């Protein structure tokens, strides 16, 4: 990735108001900015979870959705998703579908770093064999939505806060099959 990866800053209405270096926006007083989350689904309806690298600035070592990122200024979401799928997981994303267009959250990690994002949520498929970038992904697993729901209920602290907030909304929107084996 570029050493000067930029993110889009937003006002409270979600309107772009500027840009800033990604490295400088995740602080104790993070400004609202644009991001995305993507959930990869395999042919039997399982969701790819990834465990964040211990090198990550926010929520290191926790399990989360397949991958996340920030579209750069002027970059389309689909292009950002393709870029991050390749960078984080070494695969090409396809069949990209916007499922939660208005998701927004603010969360504070144990070190005090704030996430403050307008973060549309997508589901997609992949082609190729996973080849995770160890600077981004410490581990990964395909899991049924039913098992994920159970894990979130019993061990919520093992997961990123955005996964905990997004997952019930994904189920409500019928974006994920609750039973593995169901065609996604």
Swiss-Prot record:
Its EC number is 5.3.3.2. PROSITE patterns: NUDIX. Pathway: Isoprenoid biosynthesis; dimethylallyl diphosphate biosynthesis; dimethylallyl diphosphate from isopentenyl diphosphate: step 1/1. Its main location: cytoplasm. The keyword Manganese applies. Keywords: Cytoplasm, Isomerase, Isoprene biosynthesis, Magnesium, Manganese, Metal-binding. It catalyses: isopentenyl diphosphate = dimethylallyl diphosphate. The active site is at 68, 117. Coiled coil: none annotated. Mg(2+) binds at residue 88. One of its GO terms (biological process) is dimethylallyl diphosphate biosynthetic process. Residues 31-165 form the Nudix hydrolase domain. Its cofactor is Mg(2+); Mn(2+). GO terms for molecular function: isopentenyl-diphosphate delta-isomerase activity; metal ion binding. Binds 1 Mg(2+) ion per subunit. The magnesium ion binds only when substrate is bound. Binds 1 Mn(2+) ion per subunit. It is found in: Cytoplasm. It is an enzyme of class 5 (isomerase). One of its GO terms (cellular component) is cytoplasm. Mn(2+) binds at residues 26, 33, 70, 115, 117. NCBIfam families: IPP_isom_1, PRK03759.1. PANTHER family: ISOPENTENYL-DIPHOSPHATE DELTA-ISOMERASE. Belongs to the IPP isomerase type 1 family. Catalyzes the 1,3-allylic rearrangement of the homoallylic substrate isopentenyl (IPP) to its highly electrophilic allylic isomer, dimethylallyl diphosphate (DMAPP). This is Isopentenyl-diphosphate Delta-isomerase. The lineage of its organism: Bacteria, Bacillati, Actinomycetota, Actinomycetes, Micrococcales. The gene is idi.
């Amino acid at each position: 990735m570029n050493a000067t990866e930029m993110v889009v800053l937003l006002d409270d209405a979600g309107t772009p108001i500027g840009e800033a270096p990604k490295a400088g926006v995740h602080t104790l007083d993070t400004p609202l900015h644009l991001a995305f989350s993507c959930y990869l689904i395999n042919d039997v309806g399982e969701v790819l979870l990834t465990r964040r690298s211990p090198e990550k600035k926010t929520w290191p070592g926790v399990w989360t959705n397949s991958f996340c990122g920030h579209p750069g200024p002027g970059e389309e979401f689909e292009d950002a998703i393709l870029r991050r799928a390749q960078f984080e997981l070494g695969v090409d994303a396809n069949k990209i579908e916007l499922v939660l267009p208005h998701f927004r959250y603010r969360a504070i990690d144990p070190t005090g770093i704030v996430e403050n994002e307008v973060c549309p949520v997508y589901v997609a498929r992949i082609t190729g064999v996973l080849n995770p970038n160890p600077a981004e992904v410490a581990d990964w697993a395909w899991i049924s939505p039913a098992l994920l729901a159970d894990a979130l209920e019993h061990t919520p602290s093992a997961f990123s806060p955005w996964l905990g907030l997004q997952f019930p909304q994904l189920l409500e929107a019928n974006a994920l099959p609750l039973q593995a084996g169901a065609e996604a």
